[in-house]
Amino acid sequence: MISGLLKKIFGSRNDRLIRQYSQTVRAINALEPEISALSDEALQAKTADFKQRVANGESLDSILPEAFAVVREAGKRVHGMRHFDVQLIGGMVLHNGKISEMRTGEGKTLVATLPAYLNALTGKGVHVITVNDYLASRDADWMGRIYGFLGLTTGCNLSRMGHEAKQAAYASDITYGTNNEFGFDYLRDNMVYSTGERVQRGLSFAIVDEVDSILIDEARTPLIISGQAEDHTDLYLKLNQVAPMLAEQEGEGDNVIKPGDYTLDLKARQVLLTEQGHENAEQILTRMGLLAEGTSLYDPGNILLVHHLYAALRAHSLYHKDQHYVVQNNEVVIVDEFTGRLMAGRRWSDGLHQAVEAKESVRIQAENQTLASITFQNYFRMYGKLAGMTGTADTEAFEFHSIYGLETVVVPTNRAMVRKDENDKVYRTAKEKWDAVIADIRGCVERGQPVLVGTTSIEINEFLSGELNRVDLSHQVLNAKQHEHEAEIVAQAGRPGVITIATNMAGRGTDIVLGGSIERQLAAVRDDETLTPEQKEARTAALREEWKPVHEQVLANGGLHIIGTERHESRRIDNQLRGRAGRQGDPGSSRFYLSLEDPLMKIFAGERLNAIMVRLKMPEGEAIEHAMVTRSLESAQRKVEQRNFDIRKQLLEYDDVANDQRKVIYQQRNELLEADDISETIRAMRQGVLHDSFRVHVPVDSVEEQWDIAALEQALASEFQLRLPIGEWLKAEPNLDDETILKRLLAAAEEQYAVKTAQVDPVAWHQFERNVMLQSLDTHWREHLAALDHLRQGIHLRGYAQKNPKQEYKREAFELFETLLDTVRNDVSKLLMTVQVRTEAQLEEAEVPPELENVQYQHAAFDEALGVATAPEAAQAAAPAGPKIGRNDPCPCGSGKKYKHCHGKLS
């Protein structure tokens, strides 16, 4: 009550921030007459002036009013677009490293030019991140004209670009690209074998468009670069026959209606075998010769078999054609559940994709091994400054703040929003719902009102399209199968009486203009070199005059009407669909039609509402329409959002362990790449490994009778090619102590190594040492990633032993990391001691880094394992970022030791 009273008196924090920004807006507006009076040359000269002032120590904040006024003027001169006052506020929010919530149609693309220009003055580069390649190239071209006019360079980072083109894109002042591509470039930059192969130049400032989609929806999905692993094709085919032989159990616990072999967890997308299922599966697998007689499904040797059996069951019971994937050109192509797009080249991991391929009888492609991985949370937190824009962030403000430290500021609209959001209509059956949807669509067509129908999957999209064809209602379909034409379809979706059916509208990036867009015709006139400026002006005016009455007709008919055919798991995605209507103060309306057979209703509200409908004896075709129903649905969505937040938070807690280790490995890689000579590091490693090997056979503080000299001589000869007569030394010198023997051993090793290196050019040998070290580090890091993955999959079982799974994971991951570093030290030392090189040609041959087969770039979901499109073969990748770990800083692994005494020892 008191906080509410204080808010009324002083306003909320959001109100106070907007008031502060509004004062700066007044300062920018005061500069407008002066800036407008400048010639083009004088306006362009401002950029060099600003850069000099920044170089002299002036802060960006003090330059901001004048810089924003310059960008606003450039927008007017280049595109005839003047930034509104609220867009200036949005730009300030972004510059301050916050999230700017701006409604659909408020011009977020133009807003980004303000902070991008200002921050590019530092020369460190600005990354503007969008959700797809089409928007990245469109915005880079469109806004790049403003930056180019002001003397800044613009780059576009696309997935099909070559290495040199990527380097040029990153060298630009402002670089546009997709979140996936920036993340993959970072990972690839940490797999290179020379500094010249890197493309990124550090992570300074990022502006993320559709920030909720990228930092929330896709944050459950790590970026994974993988290469081909062992082939298990026969196993997939055999287990594909087993899955249909096992039956689903209906009900759980005391409420089992029909016993079965497995239960489904629809929320977690998991399958669990019942006791009956274990027995049946073992019998079937034994009959098929996959399981040895008398062995259990859970014997250590059968771990792979269990893993693939579960994958086959998930493929058959949880992943459905035309909903989760489509079959195209004899391949299984995943459908992105957030956007409804086809994700060609992406693959589910953990054998699931191969199980689906076996189910659909298409060619089974080999499984992959993880080469590098990072989550979006950990990638974006490496930027020195991070900001984002979206139309719907307020519902997730807590998550943005708790995970990314980002505050959300709701920016007021330029014009008041007048869209009418009507209560949901809930029907008993899907048939009644679809009848009502078609009746509403028909009413819109008769009124001449454009209508956009949102669906949650391609399957429903195509079902509704078929129903509309049946009743002779012409329409256009926008889903993953037509994404090449999507911008044009969306642009024309505002014409009178046009029906557009679309899967998830998140990230479409194109405004629906009432009356239809004439941007393409205007662009054709602008680019027509046969026309004089006067003719261009006349044609442009004529096009606008033709469009005006159509626009006014749609306004009079009520603007765009939005129909939702199902509630999404997230309120935010429902709001994104609604937000397509009512842009820039236009009229519009929205309504959701639901049935008790919808997935979300089944899980959360179906039984209760069904009981109410039966009790009220509601006739067929009658709907419940009440604010209470809408509220209860939003409450159900909040529960799902909370669960998804918990999943993302848990993923982050586990990935933070891997991230700390990743930082150590990547820092050591970069130190290796940048060093001309690592011979001292190699020498220290060699002496450490020899010392450890010696102490295995000659323990500290032991007597001679406990020494195993014969085994020591054999180990030195076989592992290090070091043949020393230690037994004879002891016979000749009975008083020889262990420390003296160790010193002689180390001296002999150094002498032998020096003889070997003297045979070749020192520069070539140093390069060889570095490449051996890099290859060993990379190989064992990949194996370590797989080990961490397996550890994480089974760690929850520690809870049954009254242990904290997260603490156990941290402890065991640390032990695995210690083993990784020891293995690298051993491998490198032994290889360099045993390798026989006589010519520099042999060295050069050995230096060639191993070619990785079938490299794929996956964006695999944490629980649903979504994979990512293959990036260009020629494309290399990204540079290390984040603060460097000092030698005396605490080691990020959490041991409590200094970095130089812990994981910095390798360096």
Swiss-Prot record:
Its cofactor is Zn(2+). One of its GO terms (biological process) is protein transport by the Sec complex. Belongs to the SecA family. Zn(2+) binds at residues 891, 893, 902-903. Part of the Sec protein translocase complex. Interacts with the SecYEG preprotein conducting channel. Has a central role in coupling the hydrolysis of ATP to the transfer of proteins into and across the cell membrane, serving both as a receptor for the preprotein-SecB complex and as an ATP-driven molecular motor driving the stepwise translocation of polypeptide chains across the membrane. Its EC number is 7.4.2.8. It catalyses: ATP + H2O + cellular proteinSide 1 = ADP + phosphate + cellular proteinSide 2. One of its GO terms (molecular function) is ATP binding. It comes from Aromatoleum aromaticum (strain DSM 19018 / LMG 30748 / EbN1). One of its GO terms (cellular component) is cytosol. It comes from the Bacteria. Its main location: membrane. It is found in: Cell inner membrane; Cytoplasm. Monomer and homodimer. Part of the essential Sec protein translocation apparatus which comprises SecA, SecYEG and auxiliary proteins SecDF-YajC and YidC. This is Protein translocase subunit SecA.
